[in-house]
Amino acid sequence: YQSAVKQGVNFKLGMRVQDLILNDKGRVIGVTATDKVGNKYEFTSKDGVILATGGYSQNKEMRQKSAPHLTPEMVSTNQPGATGDGIVIATRHGADTTGMNYVQVYPLATPGTGALQGRARKMSGLDDVIDVNKNGERFVKEDARRDEFVAAIKKQPGGVVYDINDSSIVKPLNSFNEDVETLVSIGRIYKADSLADLAKQLGMPADKLEASVAEFNKMVEAKNDPKFGRKLFDRPIVKPPFYATPRAPSIHHTMGGLQISTNAQVLDKKGKPIPGLYAAGEVTGGIHGSNRLGGNATADVLTFGRIAAKSAVAHK
């Protein structure tokens, strides 16, 4: 944001885009918008409009229509503005969509809120962590694809599982710069000097949790998971205190969206570009197939954002 401001970009905050503006030749030349109190505005451009409005994970109506296998009660990891407005507006003017039924669910979010935060560990990987159900048992390889992981969690009691790790990967602040001891004090994280005490706090059989950790420690030494086929290992879980973080699935990324060309032009239902309309990022579909790989959305927005800008300036 600061870099863009230095380059002369004029941000209009507190606005919601309502529609596109087209000239008499059918080219998109701007947008209409309203502010928080309902005042109406028009913004025009000589080069066109780039939609970068994100996905629709927070739009339950659109979500359920596109992916009815998801329950309306499911929360999302995303910010409240991920309501698919760009898709709604563009399709109003004939834009085509693709892959709208592909919605990715993140397996290990905060129960109830869907937030990614709230973990005990400083490091974000799973190499030093196991996940257990309410019975204290592992149920999946922790490095599984997200859709496989989610499917496995849904079969567990209550649909809630626990990250289990030791203090070797814990710092005063976690990977989201949250104070770990504060999270413990408010009950977001459980902490104990022994696995038995940790199991007691979680209401699970101590012998089951201890057995799961012992089994994992053997796997780390052998670099082999005979039960589930896990491939990623680093350190055993041996150093007290031990931590448990409740986790549950949360809607994370919508792979479907507007159909675009390789020049980031928004296409109509006949596969032809809508003049002056471009799109990049999660508002588009088809880039990530049926199941996005973690981190690839960054490459998506950087690549197609640049392509969209170049195409708009060139009036492609």
What are these regions (language model features)?
Residues 36-110, 304-307:
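Glycine-rich loop(s) and the adjacent beta-strand/alpha-helix scaffold that form part
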Residues 19, 208-291:
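A glycine-rich dinucleotide-binding beta-alpha-beta segment and adjacent secondary-structure elements
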Residues 87-89, 96-204:
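An anion/pyrophosphate-binding glycine-rich loop and adjacent beta-alpha core
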Residues 86-96, 202-205, 210-213, 301-316:
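Internal hydrophobic alpha-helix adjacent to the cofactor/substrate pocket in enzyme cavities
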Residues 105-110, 147-150, 249-255, 283-298:
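Glycine-rich phosphate/pyrophosphate-binding beta-alpha loops
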Residues 77-79, 118-123, 154, 247-251, ...:
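Short Gly/Pro-enriched turn/cap motifs at secondary-structure boundaries
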